[in-house]
């Protein structure tokens, strides 16, 4: 069999019809799957020793969230190193990365596979993979015909990468259709909400503006900060992280600005603070809403004038730091309540970003589940970890109050449970392995004071009552100490100290 001119022209026309990179890629692999009459096709981007799916047809949706490392997938490694068409026979000993990931064929293994490495000059930029359940499916196609397909795909991918590079250098205007970043940021998701967020990140990253990142706990605000830093001119310099919610008031100023020897008891030497460490780079202040008003005033001064003072030192030090701040609070309400400075809020929120909760991201749940399944597979040394159709439906129907972090933990727990009930190194996750309705239990009803155990004295009764209140607050807030402190209307540092005194934490 040979490709007719009409077939090749049809592939080229489909590429031209696409609106934006993603649409072109999808049209390409859908058309190629039809031409080769196979069960599945995929276009992969190569970056940093791994293949990243850009478009798929005939494969489970969670494949788009997986990241295929060369060391973890011998077939993909063979494709990357071959430099030409690679055909895997039906009896190949190398496991196929898509085993169990073709819908309706979860229990069967792929019988025929062809891989086409894609090059821009001498550089590997991606690959095309085609899979079939029929062993001899690809024998009718010559290597020369498959090379033609590879050339078309390589041209499309290379052009997309070039456009992205020129846009990032502000050498091309960013049209709404073409402006679809395809580089890897580990921010997995194709939902409208995530697509919009990625566009906003690309816009603000190249500037030097301070950014306020809002969103619920567990949505991935730190990943947003990393993406902004990586896309900025400061990427060659450090990104320094500080969790404001974990800062005891007594050391918070020293952590931010540093101290000199003898500034306070225990200051046995000079120490740089996070601002000095981030000089010429970026400082990410997580949970900034937990900072005291006194520290907010000192932070404001740094943003205004660009200088800091170490604790115990009269001298000022100049720093050049971009500040990215994150919070799960509504800082506008905090300003109205007098708990957050209005001038600091306006300094930070020049370009605010909001990370959507997982429940508003639709099918991104499945993509993220695929990513975490692949992580578990590598970590536990398994040959495959796949989601059954029932498990996918189960994940989509759940509300995810703990967002992406809860999904990650749920996948890890499900893999451990499934592995314990099935021999071998292959794991298929079923709905019953998640039991999500039990993962987030409502907090038990508060015991009345009279229902507490009899205690000898007032102090013991008070401590028991405090323990119960803290336990309930932690249960209701998914063991987030900052959120629990807000619910109890106390300072988070005081809550940590009280919990230690009551034996609730080490």
UniProtKB/Swiss-Prot annotation:
Keywords: ATP-binding, DNA-binding, Nucleotide-binding, Phosphoprotein, Transcription, Transcription regulation. GO terms for molecular function: ATP binding; ATP hydrolysis activity; DNA binding; DNA-binding transcription factor activity. Coiled coil: none annotated. InterPro entries: AAA+_ATPase, GAF, GAF-like_dom_sf, Homeodomain-like_sf, NorR, P-loop_NTPase, Sigma_54_int, Sigma_54_int_dom_ATP-bd_1. The modification 4-aspartylphosphate is found at residue 57. SMART domains: AAA, GAF. ATP binds at residues 215-222, 278-287. The keyword ATP-binding applies. Gene3D superfamilies: 1.10.8.60, 3.30.450.40, Homeodomain-like (1.10.10.60), P-loop containing nucleotide triphosphate hydrolases (3.40.50.300). It comes from the Bacteria. Pfam families: GAF (PF01590), Sigma54_activat (PF00158). Residues 481-500 bind DNA. Residues 187-416 form the Sigma-54 factor interaction domain. One of its GO terms (biological process) is phosphorelay signal transduction system. Pathway: Nitrogen metabolism; nitric oxide reduction. PANTHER family: ANAEROBIC NITRIC OXIDE REDUCTASE TRANSCRIPTION REGULATOR NORR (PTHR32071:SF35), TRANSCRIPTIONAL REGULATORY PROTEIN (PTHR32071). Required for the expression of anaerobic nitric oxide (NO) reductase, acts as a transcriptional activator for at least the norVW operon. Activation also requires sigma-54. This is Anaerobic nitric oxide reductase transcription regulator NorR. It comes from Salmonella arizonae (strain ATCC BAA-731 / CDC346-86 / RSK2980).
């Amino acid at each position: 069999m040979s490709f007719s001119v009409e077939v090749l022209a049809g592939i080229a026309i489909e590429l031209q019809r696409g609106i934006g990179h993603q649409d072109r890629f999808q049209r390409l692999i859908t058309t190629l799957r039809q031409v080769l009459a196979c069960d599945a096709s995929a276009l992969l981007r190569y970056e940093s020793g791994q293949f990243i799916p850009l478009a798929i047809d005939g494969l489970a949706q969670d494949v788009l969230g997986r990241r295929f490392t060369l060391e973890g997938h011998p077939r993909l490694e063979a494709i990357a190193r071959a430099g030409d068409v690679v055909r895997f026979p039906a009896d190949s000993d190398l496991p196929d990365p898509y085993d169990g990931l073709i819908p309706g064929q979860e229990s069967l293994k792929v019988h025929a596979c062809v891989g086409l490495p894609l090059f821009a000059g001498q550089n590997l930029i991606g690959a095309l993979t085609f899979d079939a359940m029929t062993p001899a499916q690809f024998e009718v196609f010559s290597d020369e015909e498959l090379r033609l397909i590879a050339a078309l795909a390589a041209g499309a991918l290379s052009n997309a990468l070039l456009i992205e590079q020129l846009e990032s250098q502000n050498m091309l205007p960013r049209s709404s259709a073409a402006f679809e970043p395809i580089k890897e940021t580990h921010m997995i998701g194709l939902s409208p909400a995530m697509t919009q967020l990625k566009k906003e990140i690309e816009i603000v990253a190249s500037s030097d503006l301070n950014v306020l990142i809002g969103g619920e706990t567990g949505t991935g605000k730190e990943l947003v900060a990393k993406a902004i830093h990586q896309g900025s001119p400061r990427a060659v310099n450090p990104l320094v992280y500080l969790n404001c919610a974990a800062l005891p008031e007594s050391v918070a100023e020293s952590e931010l600005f540093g101290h000199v020897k003898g500034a306070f008891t225990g200051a046995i030497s000079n120490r740089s603070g996070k601002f000095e460490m981030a000089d010429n780079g970026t400082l990410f202040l997580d949970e900034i809403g937990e900072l005291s008003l006194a520290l907010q005033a000192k932070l404001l001064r740094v943003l205004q004038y660009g200088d800091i003072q170490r604790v115990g030192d009269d001298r000022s030090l100049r720093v050049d730091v971009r500040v990215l701040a994150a919070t799960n609070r509504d800082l506008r309400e905090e300003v109205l309540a007098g708990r957050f400075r209005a001038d600091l809020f306006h300094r930070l929120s020049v370009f605010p970003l909001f990370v959507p909760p997982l429940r508003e991201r639709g099918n991104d749940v499945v993509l993220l589940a695929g990513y975490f399944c692949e992580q578990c597979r590598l970590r536990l040394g398994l040959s495959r970890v796949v989601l059954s159709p029932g498990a996918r439906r189960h994940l989509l129907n759940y509300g995810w109050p703990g967002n992406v972090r809860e999904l990650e933990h749920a996948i890890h727990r499900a893999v451990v449970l499934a592995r314990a009930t099935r021999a071998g190194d292959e794991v298929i996750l079923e709905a019953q392995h998640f039991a999500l309705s039990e993962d987030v239990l409502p907090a038990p009803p508060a015991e009345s004071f009279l229902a507490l155990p009899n205690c000898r004295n007032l102090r013991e009764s008070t401590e028991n009552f405090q323990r119960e209140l803290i336990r309930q607050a932690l249960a209701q807030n998914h063991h987030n100490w900052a959120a629990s402190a807000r619910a109890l209307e106390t300072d988070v540092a005081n809550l940590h100290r009280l919990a230690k005194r009551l034996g609730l934490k080490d």
